[in-house]
Amino acid sequence: MSFKVCFRCDAGIHPEIGTGHITRSLFLAKNFISNNMLKKKDILFLTRNDKGFKLGKKYLEKENFKFKYYSNNELSPNSSSESKIINNFGGNLIILDRLKTKKSFIKSIKQNGKKVVTFDDLGDGREISDLAVSAIFSDIEQSKNLKKGLNY
């Protein structure tokens, strides 16, 4: 099945990740729907389900969004397996909500004709994403694709 928008985010009880990434992604997905931009059936979430990351699945089940969950090895950030999964399921727009995306990873998605948006990404991948949004990190160097500050 093909989706129009694919969110790639996690949630967990982990030192480096809490629930902010998936909370923001759910907020965006709900706004796409409430503003009649998308239907729920057009949205897919990809998330990890290993120990420490099971909160993502719980949030998505509660909100009744379609999702696929994978092991940490399969969706390890910036891995070729993660890229393959996204390219197989992902729609026209891929939304990545995480901190350290690599350029090579973004390239592997964009070469398949997909648009990529990143949120609060400190990795060099944000430099080549179609849109980078940084509401939290205001000290990131400005670029033409970056929107930063609390307005975003």
State what each model feature region is:
Residues 2-18:
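Nucleotide-activated donor-dependent transferases that construct or modify glycoconjugates
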Residues 109-118:
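Short beta-strand/loop segments at the ligand-binding rim of alpha/beta enzyme cores
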Residues 70, 119-121, 135:
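Generic beta-sheet signal
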Residues 86-100:
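Short N-terminal targeting/anchoring amphipathic segment
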Residues 128-152:
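A nucleotide-sugar donor-handling region in carbohydrate enzymes
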